[in-house]
Amino acid sequence: IEAAKLLDPDDLSVYIGIPFCPTRCAYCSFVSQSIERFGEFLPAYLDALLREIAHTGKLLQASGFHIRTLYIGGGTPTTLSSARMAQLLEAIHTSFDLSRCLEFTVEGGRPDTLDEEKLRVIKAGSATRISINPQTMSDKVLAAVGRRHTARQTIEAFYQAVRAGFDDINMDLIAGLPDDDEEGFADSIRQVLALGPSNITVHTLALKKGAALFSSRAPLPPQEAVAAMLAGAEDALRDNGYEPYYLY
């Protein structure tokens, strides 16, 4: 409500999508493709995206609308190389007036796509917030959902982001992933809390037809266990000073 008071009728949010990932997570139903299989299309996609950004910038300038929030999501935007990320950010600044932008987020969802060079490029491009999303801090669960990184890489990516100058870092976790249980999820919460990100977003696994887990019918934690995961997470987060900040 307080944030809404800062907005005017001419304010808007801009979302820029990069529909590529290192691998496709088993729970994912978004429009996104593995860079290994479809990476040849990335240069053409980026070229088209840059043209669209330029065109959109002209429309915004003519209409008088103001960007208040900007979000680069995906997919995994940090699948882009440092050079391509710099190219994207330069196009954004060339085409968009960000003088009234309250928050500029880049989704760095996969820790294995982050390094200090890329994070510094993103920070230099005036991003104010980055999201580093382990989804779980269990290497066993990560393997079960097809993510090729470890919990250790998540921790390393977090501290790299801090060294790059980010002080607004979000981290996502998902309750209900295969091979997870109440104690495992509680441990993920504990490990993320130990890092002290500014936001912790807890999702519940929601499978749709496009997800590999939907068609495979792999065994998942029972609903009662997922409910307990969420209740435990809320207690732990509130005990550590975190408050609910948005509805997903």
Please report, for each region that a protein language model flagged, where it lies by residue:
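Short, well-ordered beta-strand segments
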Residues: V14-Y15, G73
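Conserved non-cysteine loop/helix-boundary elements of the Radical SAM core domain that shape
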Residues: S32-D235
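N-terminal [4Fe-4S]-dependent radical SAM core
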Residues: I1-V14, S63
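A generic secondary-structure signal marking the coil-to-beta-strand transition
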Residues: D10-V14, R68, G196, G241
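Local cysteine-cluster metal-coordination motifs and their immediate loop/turn environment
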Residues: G17-S32
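C-terminal accessory regions of radical SAM enzymes
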Residues: R238-Y248
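Conserved acidic functional residues
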Residues: G17-P19, D172, Y248
